[in-house]
């Protein structure tokens, strides 16, 4: 991979991946097992797990700029959105919906996660939420 052809983040991520490629299958198995165990513990008691989409309000433009180092972006991304990663990698169904606006008028999202294979439950919930509280665009579309 030619460093001149990629943004710093993409180049750093590629190098990190290539350095750790032999560990990736094991890491994915561990994550899937962890999520399976969590799924059994939590989703046996609850239909939906509700978390914020992000841990902070909408950051300024450039907060996750691809011109930053991959290490810095990963640090910021993991602090900014610590809740979505597990579902994204493990395959546990989840969706994020805009549920309101902050004091600056920026969207605030909630993530809804269901048990493994409960995709239909999430879609039904999203439909009900949309019917009860339709999203209004921030700007004229």
Whereabouts are the PLM-identified features?
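Conserved acidic residues
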Residues: 47-49
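Structural helix-boundary/capping segments
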Residues: 25, 88-141
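Short, surface-exposed loop/helix-turn segments at secondary-structure junctions
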Residues: 59-80
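Structured helix-beta-strand junction loops
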Residues: 30, 44-45, 132
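Short helix-loop capping/hinge segments that flank enzyme active sites or metal/cofactor-binding pockets
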Residues: 1-40, 52, 56, 93, ...
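A short, aliphatic-rich alpha-helical micro-motif
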Residues: 42-43, 87
């Amino acid at each position: 991979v030619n460093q001149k052809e990629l943004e710093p983040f993409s180049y750093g991520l590629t190098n990190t991946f290539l350095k750790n490629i032999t560990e990736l299958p094991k890491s994915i198995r561990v994550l899937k097992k962890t999520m399976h165990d969590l799924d059994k513990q939590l989703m046996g008691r609850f239909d939906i797990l509700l978390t914020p989409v992000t841990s902070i309000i909408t950051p300024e433009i450039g907060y996750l700029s691809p011109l930053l180092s991959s290490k810095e972006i990963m640090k910021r991304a993991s602090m900014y959105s610590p809740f979505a990663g597990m579902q994204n990698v493990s395959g546990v169904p989840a969706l994020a919906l805009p549920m309101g606006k902050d004091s600056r008028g920026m969207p605030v999202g909630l993530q809804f996660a269901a048990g493994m294979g409960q995709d239909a439950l999430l879609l039904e919930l999203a439909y009900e939420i949309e019917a009860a509280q339709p999203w209004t665009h921030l700007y004229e579309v």
